[in-house]
Design a protein with these regions (language model features):
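Secondary-structure boundary elements
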Residues: 67, 71-207, 211, 265, ...
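Boundary/linker segments of alpha-helical solenoid repeat arrays
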Residues: 505-518, 547-561
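TPR/TPR-like (Sel1-like) alpha-helical repeat modules
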Residues: 501-502, 533-553
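Hydrophobic/aromatic-rich core segments of domains that either
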Residues: 145, 149, 153-158, 164-174, ...
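Bacterial signal peptide processing site
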Residues: 25-28
C-alpha cells in the first residue's frame, strides 16, 4: 500500500543534524511508564508486565468517574498558566484510574484501520496505538486538542464547513507569519519542524517546497476540530532516466548494464492543502497565505475546477516576478495522479482517544480521534478517478517521536521558545490570548511591556536581563497588535504594527530572531489598509520584500488592487527600517 514510515535517525535528512545531549521539557515517557500509584487491581496489565491475570476491582460509580476525569482535565488546563508542577503526571495517573477495568478489546484498532496503518507504521508504533496504559504523551495530546478546539470553534463560528474553514485559514495567515527555512536555528542547533502547539506559541512557521509545512499542519489540526478533513496534496513530474555511464563512473556495481537505464521515480511534490467540504476538495495554499480563487476570482477553487480550467492556476502566476510552479498541465501529467498526505499525529490514530472523546462533552468537548481508514476513504471518494495514493504524512509522527526521545531535537525546538520560558511573563499572556481571553491577554501584555527591573516570575529577587526584556517588549507589541486585530479594533492594531516597524531593523542586521516580525507586520498592515479602502498604502505594504513564499501571496494581493485602478498614482515610499533599535 505504501512504504512504512521510518522513525529512525535518518528520516528526511534531519538525523544527520541531530544528535547529542541536553535537557528536555518534553517528558521521555515510554509506553508503560506512568506515575506510581496508577495501577489498581483490575487494570489490564501493561505490555511486558509479569502479571498475567487481572484481579477483580469494585467498579467506580459514575459520579466518582466524572470527578476523576474533570480533575484530570483541570490539571492539564492549569499546566500552562501555572507551570512548574507535575500536572501532566497527575493528569496521566487520573486517566489511568478513569479507564481502569476497560475491556482490552476496546483498545484495539478495527480491521480496516489496522489494514491501512500496518504497512506504514513500525510494529512498535502499532503496539503503542493499542496499549491500555495512558502516558504523558496522551495528556499532551489532550492539552493540544483542547487548545485547537478552542481556537477553531471561536474563530470558525457558525456556518457550513467551507465558511468555517475559510475563517480558520484567514486567522492562521494573520496570526502566524512565515520565516525562511533555517532562520530559527543556530550554529549549534538546526531548526527542526515544530508541532502546531509550538507554532501557535511563537507565532512563526516555516513553509517551503517539499519538507517544511508548519502552517499547513496547523490548518490540518484546527480543521480537525471543525470535523473537516484536510490533507496535503501531492503530485509527481515523471521519472528520471539514469545515464549509461554515470553509475559506472561512480564505481557502482552493474554500471553500464541494462539496469543503468532503469527509470527512477521522482519524489512526490508537496503542493498545498485540500479541505473536504460538501463533496469537494477546496484548495488552500498556506505557503502564500491564500486560498486558490475559484472561477473569475470568486470563492475558493476546488481541485476539480483547477483540473478543468487552466486559468485558475495560471492566475496564480506572476510573470517576471514570481512563478507559481504548479499548473493544470503538471497535475494532469502526474504519473502518480493526485496523492494525499494525512496527519500522522499518533493521538488521532489511537483507539484510546476514541474512548476518551466519547466521555468529553459541554465545555470540555474536543476532537481527539479520527479513524484513519475512514479519512482515507473520504479523500478517495471525493478525488475519484484522479486519486493516487492516500497515506500518512511522516513528519507529524516523526516530530512527536523525537520530542520524547531525542534530547538535541528537544533543544532545537526549545531554542525558538526561549522567551516563553515559565520564568518570564510572556507565556501566561500568550496562552490567555490563544484561549480567547483577549482582554486578559492585553492586560498581561501591557503589564510587562516596556517595564524596568521586572522580576523573574519564579524568583522575585532576580530581575529579567535587559536583552530578554527587549525581546519581551517586541513580542508584547506584536501580540497586542494581533489581539486587537482579532477584536477587529483596526485602529489600535494599526498603531501597534506601525510601532513595531519603528522598533525593528531589517532582519539579518542583528542576531535577534524577533526582527523577522517586521514581515508579518507589513503584511497585516496591507490587510488593514485594504479593508479601510486605502489601496495605495495597502499596495505599498504588500510590496515590501519578504524572503518567504508569503511574498508571492502579498504580490498577488497587490496586483489585484492595481487592476482595480490601473491608472492610480504609484504608492508613496514607506519609512525605512531603523539601522538600530531605538530606545524603548
Amino acid at each position: 500500500l505504501s512504504r512504512r514510515i521510518d522513525l529512525g535517525t535518518g528520516l528526511v535528512c534531519l538525523g544527520v543534524a541531530l544528535g547529542l545531549a541536553a535537557g528536555c521539557d518534553y517528558s521521555r515517557d515510554r509506553v508503560g511508564d506512568v506515575p506510581s500509584g496508577t495501577y489498581r487491581p483490575g487494570m489490564v496489565a501493561p505490555p511486558g508486565s509479569s502479571r498475567t491475570q487481572a484481579q477483580p476491582v469494585a467498579a467506580r460509580d459514575s459520579t466518582e468517574k466524572a470527578a476523576i476525569l474533570a480533575s484530570s482535565i483541570e490539571l492539564i488546563q492549569r499546566a500552562a498558566l501555572q507551570p512548574g508542577g507535575d500536572n501532566f503526571g497527575l493528569a496521566t495517573q487520573k486517566l489511568n484510574q478513569f479507564f481502569e477495568g476497560t475491556p482490552q478489546a476496546d483498545y484495539q484498532l478495527d480491521s480496516a484501520a489496522r489494514a491501512f496503518l500496518q504497512p506504514q507504521l513500525p510494529p512498535v508504533k502499532l503496539s503503542e496505538l493499542e496499549t491500555t496504559v495512558w502516558s504523558l504523551r496522551d495528556a499532551r495530546h489532550l492539552e493540544d486538542c483542547m487548545m485547537y478546539y478552542g481556537i477553531a470553534s471561536r474563530v470558525g463560528g457558525t456556518g457550513d464547513d467551507l465558511v468555517r474553514a475559510r475563517r480558520v485559514f484567514d486567522w492562521i495567515v494573520r496570526q502566524i507569519q512565515l520565516v525562511p527555512p533555517g532562520s530559527l536555528g543556530s550554529p549549534q542547533l538546526p531548526q527542526v519542524p515544530a508541532r502546531p502547539y509550538d507554532v501557535l506559541l511563537r507565532g512563526m512557521a516555516t513553509e517551503s517546497e517539499g519538507f517544511w509545512a508548519e502552517r499547513s499542519w496547523l490548518f490540518m489540526a484546527l480543521c480537525r476540530q471543525l470535523g473537516v478533513d484536510v490533507g496535503l496534496v501531492t503530485y509527481s513530474r515523471g521519472n528520471v532516466v539514469e545515464p549509461l555511464v554515470g553509475r559506472a563512473g561512480r564505481g557502482e556495481r552493474g554500471g553500464g548494464g541494462l539496469s543503468a537505464m532503469a527509470k527512477q521515480p521522482k519524489p512526490d511534490i508537496v503542493w498545498l492543502c485540500a479541505a473536504l467540504a460538501g463533496g469537494q476538495a477546496y484548495l488552500f495554499d498556506a505557503r502564500i497565505g491564500l486560498p486558490i480563487p475559484g472561477p473569475d476570482g470568486q470563492g475558493v477553487a476546488t481541485l476539480n475546477q483547477a483540473l478543468a480550467d487552466p486559468a485558475i492556476l495560471e492566475r496564480m502566476n506572476l510573470p517576471g516576478q514570481s512563478p507559481y510552479g504548479t499548473s493544470r498541465a503538471s497535475l494532469l501529467a502526474s504519473p502518480s495522479r493526485i496523492g494525499i498526505l494525512m496527519d500522522s499525529s499518533q493521538g488521532f490514530l489511537s483507539p484510546r482517544m476514541k474512548l476518551l472523546q466519547r466521555d468529553l462533552a459541554g465545555k470540555n468537548r474536543t476532537i481527539l480521534y479520527r479513524d484513519p481508514s475512514q479519512q482515507r476513504d473520504h479523500f478517495a471518494r471525493v478525488l475519484g478517478d484522479r486519486c493516487g495514493e492516500v497515506k500518512l504524512w511522516s513528519i507529524p509522527l516523526y516530530v512527536e517521536t523525537e520530542l520524547f526521545r531525542n534530547a538535541q531535537f528537544v533543544q532545537s525546538s526549545l531554542q525558538t521558545l526561549r522567551l516563553f520560558s515559565p520564568e518570564f511573563p510572556l507565556i501566561v499572556a500568550r496562552i490567555k490570548h490563544l484561549r480567547g481571553d483577549l482582554s486578559g491577554a492585553i492586560q498581561e501584555y501591557v503589564s510587562f511591556r516596556l517595564a524596568e527591573n521586572l522580576p523573574l516570575v519564579n524568583d522575585k529577587k532576580k530581575t529579567i536581563p535587559k536583552e530578554i526584556q527587549d525581546g519581551l517588549d517586541i513580542y508584547a507589541t506584536n501580540y497586542l497588535a494581533l489581539a486587537q486585530l482579532e477584536r477587529n479594533s483596526h485602529v489600535q492594531a494599526e498603531s501597534m504594527f506601525l510601532r513595531l516597524l519603528e522598533l525593528l531593523p531589517q532582519p539579518g542586521s542583528n542576531p535577534h530572531r524577533y526582527n523577522m516580525l517586521r514581515w508579518g507586520a507589513q503584511a497585516n498592515l496591507g490587510r488593514i489598509y485594504e479593508a479601510k479602502g486605502d489601496m495605495r498604502r495597502a499596495i505599498a505594504y504588500y510590496g515590501q520584500l519578504d524572503p518567504t513564499m508569503q511574498y508571492h501571496g502579498n504580490l498577488l494581493r497587490a496586483r489585484d488592487l492595481v487592476w482595480q485602478e490601473p491608472m492610480a498614482a504609484a504608492p508613496d515610499p514607506l519609512p525605512p527600517a531603523p539601522k538600530v533599535p531605538p530606545g524603548r
